[in-house]
Structures are given as C-alpha cells and as structure tokens.
Amino acid sequence: IENDKRGIEKLRLAYKNVLFAVPKNVYIIGMMNTADRSLAIMDYALRRRFSFYEIEPAFGKDNFKNHLKANGVTESMIKKINDNFIALNNYIADEKNSGLGSGFRIGHSYFCTKPNCDEDKWYANIIKFEIQPMLEEYWFDEKDKVGEWMGKIK
C-alpha cells in the first residue's frame, strides 16, 4: 500500500460509518499470475497502488534442489526436472518463437509437494494434469508445438 495511505490518520469507510487506518507495520502480500489475460484491467489499478516483486522460477537454483532432496527426490529426477523446465522456460521467454514471453514461464511450485507415490509416476502426473493443460491453453492453436514440448519433457 502507498506510504501516504498508512499511519495514524484515519479515513471514514465508504459503506460504514467507521474510521479505519492501515498501521505502518502491516503489509498486504498478494500473488498474481501475470499470464492470466483476464486480469489485465485490474492489473493496471493494482500496479498504481502496490509495489510489485517478480518471483523467478527456481529451476536450477540450489534452494530448489535442496528442497527436492529433502522431499526424497533422487538426483536423476532433480536433474530431469531442472533440465526440462529450464529449456521449456527459455523457449517460452523467447516471445519471437513461443508467442508468449517471460510472464508465461512455468514456476517451480508444481514440484514442491512431496511425492506421494513412485517419483516417476509423481512426475508423470504433474506433467499430465498440470503442465500439459497449461501448454494446451498457451498454444491452443498450435497442437504440434504442444506435442513437441510434451515429447521433450515427459
């Protein structure tokens, strides 16, 4: 929230006869997927009122590797995840080839849950039920591109 909207000065709420102030030590943290085109109009309003911090996908980063290890994921699967999604995200970020751009890169959170089955099945389920539908939406009119990348990351 803007600094001039914080502190001891209270404002009367529009729909209730109540005074309200946001304390200086209260922070509002929200998350937004910038790839969601339906948020575009709201996005401009939010950007005027809040500070934004972009979180980069953590593929290839030590913290992500350590998290996967702590969840019991093998070194070979960690390498597979990182290699596949670094390559896919590099392609997605190249707007000229992908038609998308860096705001459409796939985040690491899909792989942050502890595997609840064999890790190959865990990975295959994430690809089939999380990643593939997203790629099909991204490239809804380019089935060959979806097929190509599904073949590369399976």
Task: Report the location of each language-model feature.
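C-terminal regulatory/interaction module of P-loop NTP-utilizing enzymes
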Residues: 1-154
